[in-house]
Amino acid sequence: MLEGAKLMGAGAATIALAGAAIGIGNVFSSLIHSVARNPSLAKQLFGYAILGFALTEAIALFALMMAFLILFVF
């Protein structure tokens, strides 16, 4: 019973990974659209895109860490 609840909790925690994947897709989609509109700002926009990617990926890593904590610690 407890093992099943742990698996369900870990599965629910990994749903955030799908949201992070969508967010990363939106970041780079916006980068492509912005560079297409103004190619002279490509280097500056790429830096902002990498920052957005890192922040979005950090949320995914926190969610993955929570899933592993649910599975192996609690």
Swiss-Prot record:
Question: Which gene is transcribed and translated to give this protein?
Answer: ATP9
Q: Which Pfam families match?
A: ATP-synt_C (PF00137)
Named from the GO MF annotations, one term is: lipid binding
State what this protein does: This protein is one of the chains of the nonenzymatic membrane component (F0) of mitochondrial ATPase.
Keywords from the UniProt entry: ATP-binding, CF(0), Hydrogen ion transport, Ion transport, Lipid-binding, Membrane, Mitochondrion, Nucleotide-binding, Transmembrane, Transmembrane helix, Transport
Q: Which Gene3D superfamilies match?
A: F1F0 ATP synthase subunit C (1.20.20.10)
Gene Ontology biological process terms, A to Z: proton motive force-driven ATP synthesis
Site positions for Reversibly protonated during proton transport: 57
Q: What is this protein called?
A: ATP synthase subunit 9, mitochondrial
Organism, scientific name: Solanum tuberosum (Potato)
Task: Report how it sits in the membrane.
Answer: Multi-pass membrane protein
Q: Which family does it belong to?
A: Belongs to the ATPase C chain family.
Quote a single Gene Ontology cellular component term.
Answer: mitochondrial membrane
PANTHER family assigned to the protein according to its UniProt record, in alphabetical order? ATP SYNTHASE LIPID-BINDING PROTEIN, MITOCHONDRIAL, ATPASE PROTEIN 9
Localisation per UniProt entry? Mitochondrion membrane
Please tell me where this protein is predominantly located. Answer: mitochondrion
Q: What parts of the sequence cross the membrane? A: 8-28, 50-70
Can you state the subunit structure given in the record?
A: F-type ATPases have 2 components, CF(1) - the catalytic core - and CF(0) - the membrane proton channel. CF(1) has five subunits: alpha(3), beta(3), gamma(1), delta(1), epsilon(1). CF(0) has three main subunits: a, b and c.
